[in-house]
């Protein structure tokens, strides 16, 4: 990896990223590697995951791909086990995998959509932390960042189930932070606003420029964010420089939630 001022923040560290095949997860995986970490790229899509690994290794970094569906507990057990088998430790985890689901008012939502959203966004984060934390304790401590959303602190019409799931992620994170603060494991959330990703495309349609323009204009900063901007926030929370930061929700939303 090319050197930079911060190129050694994660030297000799092992970082695990779920949902790392695209968007914010991909950007974070590459950023961790750029700053010295060995990276475990986890996701459901093998071709995309291996492409992320190639992007890292072609630049001189070290990474592996582990096919993982966070809605399956056995997959997460296998993911953490493979991480320890390959690298011998786990120092950092970014639990990024999530699901937007179908958008509709509450009275029009379905049990099926509820289950799909909560299985990915809440149960997946719960299982991830459940197995990551013991691995980190065995490695002398570590840092977990869970991907929440600006929707985790506000309401948003038609996004009710997604919003509820992200409130839950923040609650789980704060509780875990309290439980492990004196044992060397920090736990925080990052809460992105409107970010130009595949998930946004799935909400509005890849070619729906009108809705995206409207969404961008709702942010006082006047635009949508980038995956790399969120990744920068994730790396801050993960790094030793944030050693006194735990139980915090870092909002990266261009002032959307303080309008």
Model-predicted regions and their roles:
Residues 129, 165, 173:
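Active-site helix of classical SDR
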Residues 107-126, 145, 169:
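Catalytic Tyr-X3-Lys loop
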Residues 181, 186, 245-247:
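Short, small/polar-rich loop/turn modules that mediate ligand/substrate recognition or access, typified
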Residues 126-129, 137, 223-252, 257:
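C-terminal substrate-recognition "lid" of short-chain dehydrogenase/reductases
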């Amino acid at each position: 990896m090319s050197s930079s001022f911060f190129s050694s923040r994660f030297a000799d560290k092992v970082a695990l990223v779920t949902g790392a095949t695209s968007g914010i997860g991909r950007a974070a995986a590459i950023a961790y590697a750029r700053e010295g970490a060995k990276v475990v790229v986890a996701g459901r899509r093998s071709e995309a995951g291996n492409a992320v690994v190639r992007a890292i290794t072609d630049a001189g970094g070290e990474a592996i791909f582990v096919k993982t569906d966070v809605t399956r507990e056995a997959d997460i057990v296998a993911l953490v086990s493979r991480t320890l088998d390959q690298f011998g430790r786990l120092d950092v985890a970014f639990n990024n995998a999530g699901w937007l689901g179908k958008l509709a008012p509450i009275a029009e939502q379905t049990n099926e959509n509820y289950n799909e959203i909560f299985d990915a966004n809440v149960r997946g984060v719960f299982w991830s932390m459940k197995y990551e934390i013991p691995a980190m304790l065995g490695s002398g401590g570590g840092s977990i960042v869970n991907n929440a959303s600006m929707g985790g602190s506000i309401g948003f019409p038609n996004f009710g189930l997604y919003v509820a799931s992200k409130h839950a992620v923040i609650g789980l994170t704060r509780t875990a932070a309290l439980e492990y603060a004196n044992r060397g494991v920090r736990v925080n959330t990052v809460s992105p606003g409107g970010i130009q990703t595949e998930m946004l495309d799935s909400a509005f349609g890849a070619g729906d420029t009108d809705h995206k323009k409207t969404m961008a204009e709702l942010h006082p900063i006047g635009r949508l964010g980038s995956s790399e901007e969120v990744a920068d926030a994730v790396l801050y929370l993960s790094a030793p420089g944030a050693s006194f930061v735990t139980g915090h929700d870092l909002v990266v939303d261009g002032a959307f939630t303080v309008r």
